[in-house]
Each structure stands twice: as C-alpha cells, then as structure tokens.
Amino acid sequence: MRVLLSTAGSRGDVEPLVALAVRLQGLGVEARMCASPASAERLAEVGVPHVPVGLQLEGMLLQEGMPPPSPEEERRLAAKAIDMQFDEVPAAAEGCAAVVAAGELAAAAAVRSVAEMLGIPYFYAAYSPNYLPSPHHAPPEDERTTPGVTDNKVLWDERGQRFAKRYGDTLNSRRASVGLPPVEDVFGYGYSERPWLATDPILAPLPPDFDAVQTGTWILPDERPLSAELEAFLAAGSPPVYLGFGSASGPGIDDAARVAIEAIRAHGRRIVLLSGWADLVRPDDGADCFSVDEVNLQVLFSRAAAAIHHGSAGTEHLATLAGIPQIVIPRHTDQPYYAERVADLGIGVALEGPVPTFDAMSAAVATALAPETRARATAVAGTIRTDGAAVAARLLLDAVSREKSAVLA
C-alpha cells in the first residue's frame, strides 16, 4: 500500500508527518511526502521519499523593518501556493490509497481537490485545537478582524470569508480545469468533515462538541547525538536554559532574545541559544552562552534547566514531554494558545509579547527555576501520550480498508 503525506509549512509542520511516515513504514506501508524543498535533508535522514512542493518559506520571512506584503502580493503568493499543489501533487498521489495533509490550509484544500480528482480518501490533521472552528474559542490571532467583534462564531465566519476571498478564485479555477465543481466553503473543505487533532489530550484537549478525532501528538523518537562541542559545554557547568524561537521571526524577536539572555545571566544560569530562522546570534563572546543551528531538542531538553521558546505545537509538546519548566513568548497562530496552556497547567510562565520587559522576564526565569515548577512539569510529563503516530497510522489503515470494502460491496 502507498500513502501520500503532504504539507506546506515550516519544520514544525513537517516533523509530525515524519513521525507518521516512519510509523506507517513500520507497518509495511510505502509513505512518501510532499513538502517544501527545505525538508529534503530531514526526510533523507529518516528514509522518507521526498517530493519537493511549495515555496521556500525561509526566504519569505519578515525581518526587522520590513513592511508586510501588499494585498496584491498576498493574492499572488496565494495563487502560486495553490497552483504548485495542483501542478506537482497529482503525480505524487498516483497509485496512493489515501492522502493525509497538514499545515497551511489553502495548500491542503488544493491537495484535497487532487484526492477528489483521483477518487481516494483525504484526511487533514491539525496541530492545535485553536485551529478548529469552535464557539468556545476565537480563531488564531494572525488575521485582521472587524473592530469590536468578540463573538467567536462571527469571528470564525469572518475568517472563512477572508479565506474564500483570498483563495477561492484560484482554487475553483484549477478545480474546473480538471472537471471538479466549485467549492464555496474553502476553509471547511480543507479541514474536511472530521479532521484529526494531532495533539496530546492533557496539553491540548479537543474543544467540547467538536467532531474531530484526537490521536495524541505525533513524535518520532530522536536518537541523534549532540555535537561534541555542545556535550563539552553541558559537562562544564550546571544545566543551562534553552532559548530559541524555531521558525518564528519578525519585528522584536532579536530584542526578545536579548532580554531573555540578560535575565538568564542575572540568575547565574548559562544559555544554549538556537539561531533558528531569525538567525539569532550571541550578544558577545561570553563562555556562558553556546549557539547552535540544529540540535536534537529531545536530548537537549532532557538536560536543560528550563526552556524559553515561542510556543509552537512541536516545541511545546517536546518541552512538556521532557518535563522541563517553560517560559513562552508567543507571537501568532497557535502560540498564544499553547502559552495559555503552559500557564494553566502550572508548568511555566506565559509572557506578553513580542518583547517582554527585563523585570517580567527575570520574574519568569525565577518562577521557571523554582523547585515547585519543576515538580509540576515532571508530573505533567508523566501524563503525556507518546503513541499518537501509531494511533493515526492504525486509523488510516482502517479507513482505507473500509473504503475498499465499500467499493467491493
């Protein structure tokens, strides 16, 4: 059996699908993945065939002083993202028994259109509950809304309308070119009628009354060793504080890192700094700060005193599973949700962004380093499920089996 996995997004969108792909391969399924060109090295490491599809996101990030894209540029990029899926995914999906998509929803809607054209089942996986439309929470804080509107249902309706306006014409034009009818609710079409929620039920529970399948988080055990230089740094002193913002970028991120380093040093702690997509650099040549470009977070977190990060789903699940206290400085999308969950669970501190004050950061570091916070983080870590990818793999195989039985009947 052959299955296609597809995502348009950052490393955080790719890694859960890597876990699912490896699990499927262990069950004898041939899993291949459509992902950005930047994913080539990672997929080669785990032996998952890679079909390069999508934009090179790292080169499109907003840096300090850069204006946001104009509406015309947004529409151009939206059309290009959808066109690339229609151009490349059909060949990759040929002969596949099912398609699983995750990440950017417009690309997923195009991928579902390809699955519809080929007559194969489609599944969408979300990495955060706040991506799922619900009257119990507002949409992610990454879109303009009508001033003064607070009703969650209205906010979700507005989001769907903006989505259709931005992507609908391109999507339906490409659908018409392959004989498919137009889609009015582009937003809902991408999500599917019953999406999967690839999150841990303790850390990120399913919203009440929402028809979705929660599988648990998809994490691939990472056995890559730390570099000899990092091992030497860790051995030379007490456990450091990890500081990194992953694929986050934009105005204020350099200042946030600077304030965090000052606060960590004020508490007499060392730092491991992840450069990330923002290309963060050490502020000086101090021996108490070690910089890394790529690192096994599963191993590093197990040896760190605390983690200061942006709160994306992937980093959040890894830090929670490791049982280390966290300080979350959220910026957008799922990050405010996970920051709030860290505070609610008592496993760390959620700070207001994008640049906390030194006093706020210093107080957060004190809380994170407190023994009671570590004890609570350790307790919560013991409740986190690690079988989410296995659950999803079995769900997928069962669904394909039912589909085949229905066809034969």
From Swiss-Prot:
Superkingdom as given in the UniProt entry: Bacteria
Keyword annotations of the record: Antibiotic biosynthesis, Glycosyltransferase, Transferase
Catalysed transformations (reactions): dTDP-beta-L-vancosamine + devancoaminyl-vancomycin = epivancomycin + dTDP + H(+); chloroorienticin B + dTDP-beta-L-vancosamine = chloroeremomycin + dTDP + H(+)
Note: In A.orientalis different glycosyltransferases are involved in biosynthesis of the vancomycin group of antibiotics. GtfA (AC P96558), GtfB (AC P96559) and GtfC are involved in biosynthesis of antibiotic chloroeremomycin, while GtfD (AC Q9AFC7) and GtfE (AC G4V4R9) are involved in biosynthesis of vancomycin.
Phylogenetic placement of the source organism: Bacteria, Bacillati, Actinomycetota, Actinomycetes, Pseudonocardiales
EC number: 2.4.1.-
Xref: InterPro entries: EryCIII-like_C, Glycosyltransferase_28, GlycoTrans_28_N, UDP_glucos_trans
Pathway: Antibiotic biosynthesis; vancomycin biosynthesis
Family indicated by similarity: Belongs to the glycosyltransferase 28 family.
Pfam family, one: Glyco_transf_28
Function: Catalyzes the attachment of dTDP-L-4-epi-vancosamine to chloroorienticin B to form chloroeremomycin in the biosynthesis of glycopeptide antibiotic chloroeremomycin, a member of the vancomycin group of antibiotics. Also able to use dTDP-L-4-epi-vancosamine and devancoaminyl-vancomycin (DVV) to create epivancomycin. Acts downstream of GtfA.
Coiled-coil stretches: none
GO biological process, one term: lipid glycosylation
UniProt enzyme class: transferase
Full protein name: Glycosyltransferase GtfC
Species this chain originates from: Amycolatopsis orientalis
GO MF annotation: an example: hexosyltransferase activity
